[in-house]
Amino acid sequence: MMAAAMVLAPLGARAELAVAANDGKQLLAGETAHLMPDSVAVLDLAASPVRVVGRVNAPASMIGSPNAVAVARDQSFAIVTAAQKHNPADPLNPVSDDKVSVIDLADPANPKLLQTVKAGPNAAGVTLNRAGTLALVAARDEGAIYAFTVANKKLTAAGKVTLGKGTAPADVVFAPDGRHAYAVAWDAGKLFELSVDGARVTRTGRELVTGRSAYGAVVTPDGRWLISTNVGGTGADQTGSVTVTDLRTLTLASVTRAGKTPEHVLLSPDGRHVAVVLANGAATSRTDPAWNRVVGLFKVYVLENGRLKEVARADTCHWAQGAAWNANGTLLFQQCAAERELIGFRFDGKTLVRDKAITLPFAARPGAIATAHSR
């Protein structure tokens, strides 16, 4: 549910859609906000200014993967996971959920909740193949990856791949050719390679240690590199890291010391630039004495031959969550859970500058966002 002040705008002829999941149950002690429905918002990133064009109530979660939304390449539907649900016995501590929902985007101004099915508990990252025929969901609490076939905007369970106890997959991502996928296991600190043959998904047996608390990943458009985050760092350094993996050999190409809590990693649509969302130890509540001292960070790197070189950075907000690029890589959007906003930045290849005209308020806490070109 959006803030009352937000007016839904008509959709332009060249809509560039982003789908954002918003969590209405994440409450903090002492705040005045109250429980509200989870929701999914549809934004037009091509509009000037960027605006919300539609919304629908649907299960969603802020605590969990920022890759909890996947949008079909033709922008006709989206899939949204919910890692948590409201806990009536203890409203300040939601419990694990297993929901996976399909959102119809045929009329973006009037999105519809078509279906909600179950994966495993703590349903986190979701990935959709480019053909839009198979979806994979990481079930963190179960240590498994669930597969669903997709036809006519409907999910049908197609089995699961068990990674094992103590793996806790937080994310999963398809390679561009759809024949492989990679599970990102938080507890194991590993990538697990999966083979995809139609609707049959199996482990290849190839694994790679990337770092502590491996969280999320994205693959370059040519399928060569996988870029992933490690909240607990790599090796002796416990600072959050970003690793680049060569998928030809499943070996580490480089490790970059990124900063505190790399929450989300995302590629520009041309695959040249890598943006990293850093929560950076910023406060989650305005009552925190550190509220005005520490904020989140955006860092943008150029990817060259498997290595990352920082080219720009900017301060962001508090409790930073998911992010998205626009189609031509000139705008970056950041979800701010504490402020309950989505904010925008302009990127020219060398600088990243806040555009205060792009500030969209939400009633629920934004938690995940994706476009058709996100992954």
Task: Enumerate the predicted regions with their spans.
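Gram-negative bacterial Sec-dependent N-terminal signal peptides
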Residues: 1-13
